Every structure is written in structure tokens, then in C-alpha cells.
């Protein structure tokens, strides 16, 4: 019995902040170690208060929900910027892409992020490049003189004449259309005698 009390005092001294409940069979002197007996340990509440607030962190990516993160990120603004048969200036970006969906053709360069850009001033053409590839080229623009008899040219001239008439009416003087004058070329009599017709 003396051994049990000294053992309990040693335990109480070792666990200074802990207290064994009075319902414990150990303090009452019951030394039967059966599976039915249980120890209950109570801790004082003032020692349980944490000095800093606790933060709960997940140890694994899955626990943190990384599969749900990053879904609302903005797009990368990829795609075709200048389409076929449109004018491109030197240095103009034609396509921004990941990898080479489009390959570089004539008069275009390719950047380290596979951006295709124009090297000259001209028209952009999208061409087939093999069975399953596409190539982008820029060809110099050939300026074709406009046909003066085309519908667009006649319309432009008609509107120009209307503007001139309206301007003349505002300035209070009559506007007369310039009439085409027939100019006849006449040769002097001396030249006609010197060069007789045969």
C-alpha cells in the first residue's frame, strides 16, 4: 500500500498541471488491473489557451482544393490578329499561338513564343503547307491604277460635282459646267506646200 501511495505522489509531482479525478480506482486503493478500469485525466482550462491564434493548413495539394483553383484566370489573347487579304505593316503581329499551329512562310518572322509577325508592308495570305499544316506569308502590295470608268470612280466624281454646285450656290454665283472645247489643229500653208500628200 505504501508503494502505491508513493507511486501516486510521484505521478502527481510529475504531472503538476494535471489532476487525477477522484473517481479513479487507483487513488482509492483498488489495484486490480482489469480491462474495465479506466484512467481519466483532466487538464486545467487556463493552460489550454493558445498564446497565438491557430491557423489550419493542409498538408497536401488535394486537401487545399487545387483542382478547383485557377479556373477564373483571364485568357491569354491568342489567335489570329490579321486575317487573309488584309494589310500588314512591318512588325505587325499576325498570329499569337502556343506551339506552331501556323508555320512561318515568306516575309514573316516567328518569335520565341511562336508569334508570327510581318517583316514587310503587304497583304497577308494563309496557304496550305503539306497535308495538314498551314503557312502564313506576306506578299508586297501591288497598287493597280483605278479604272476611271468604274462605278466607284464615276460615283466619286458625281458627288464631287454636287459639292462644287452647292458651294457655288452658297457664294451666290452661278456655276456652269465646264463644256469640253474642241480644239482643231491647223497647219500653216507653207508646211502644206512643203509636204505634199502623195
Curated annotation (Swiss-Prot):
Disruption phenotype: Embryonic lethality. Embryo development arrested at the globular stage.
Compartment(s) of residence: Plastid, Chloroplast
A Gene Ontology biological process term: translation
Location, primary (coarse class): plastid
Keyword Phosphoprotein appears in the UniProt entry: no
Keywords tagged on the record: Chloroplast, Plastid, Ribonucleoprotein, Ribosomal protein, Transit peptide
Gene Ontology molecular functions: mRNA binding; structural constituent of ribosome
Transit peptide: 1-58
Record flagged with keyword Kinase: no
Record-level GO cellular component terms: chloroplast; chloroplast envelope; chloroplast stroma; plastid; ribonucleoprotein complex; ribosome; thylakoid
Family, per entry: Belongs to the bacterial ribosomal protein bL27 family.
Cited NCBIfam families: L27 (TIGR00062)
Subunit structure as annotated in this protein's UniProt entry: Part of the 50S ribosomal subunit.
Protein name per Swiss-Prot or TrEMBL: Large ribosomal subunit protein bL27c
Organism this protein belongs to: Arabidopsis thaliana
Gene responsible for this protein: RPL27
Amino acid at each position: 500500500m505504501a508503494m502505491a501511495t508513493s507511486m501516486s505522489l510521484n505521478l502527481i509531482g510529475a504531472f503538476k498541471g494535471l489532476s487525477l479525478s477522484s473517481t479513479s480506482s487507483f487513488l482509492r486503493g483498488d489495484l486490480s488491473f482489469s480491462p474495465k478500469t479506466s484512467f481519466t485525466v483532466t487538464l486545467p482550462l487556463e493552460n489550454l489557451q493558445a498564446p497565438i491564434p491557430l491557423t489550419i493548413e493542409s498538408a497536401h495539394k488535394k486537401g487545399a482544393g487545387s483542382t478547383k483553383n485557377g479556373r477564373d484566370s483571364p485568357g491569354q489573347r491568342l489567335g489570329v490578329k490579321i486575317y487573309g487579304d488584309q494589310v500588314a505593316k512591318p512588325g505587325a503581329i499576325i498570329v499569337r499561338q502556343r506551339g506552331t499551329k501556323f508555320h512561318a512562310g515568306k516575309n514573316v518572322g516567328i518569335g520565341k513564343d511562336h508569334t508570327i509577325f510581318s517583316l514587310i508592308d503587304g497583304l497577308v495570305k494563309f496557304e496550305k503547307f503539306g497535308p495538314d499544316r498551314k503557312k502564313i506569308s506576306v506578299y508586297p502590295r501591288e497598287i493597280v491604277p483605278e479604272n476611271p470608268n468604274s462605278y466607284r470612280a464615276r460615283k466619286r466624281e458625281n458627288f464631287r460635282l454636287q459639292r462644287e454646285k452647292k458651294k457655288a450656290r452658297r457664294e451666290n454665283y452661278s456655276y456652269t459646267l465646264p463644256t469640253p472645247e474642241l480644239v482643231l489643229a491647223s497647219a500653216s500653208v507653207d508646211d502644206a506646200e512643203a509636204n505634199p500628200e502623195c
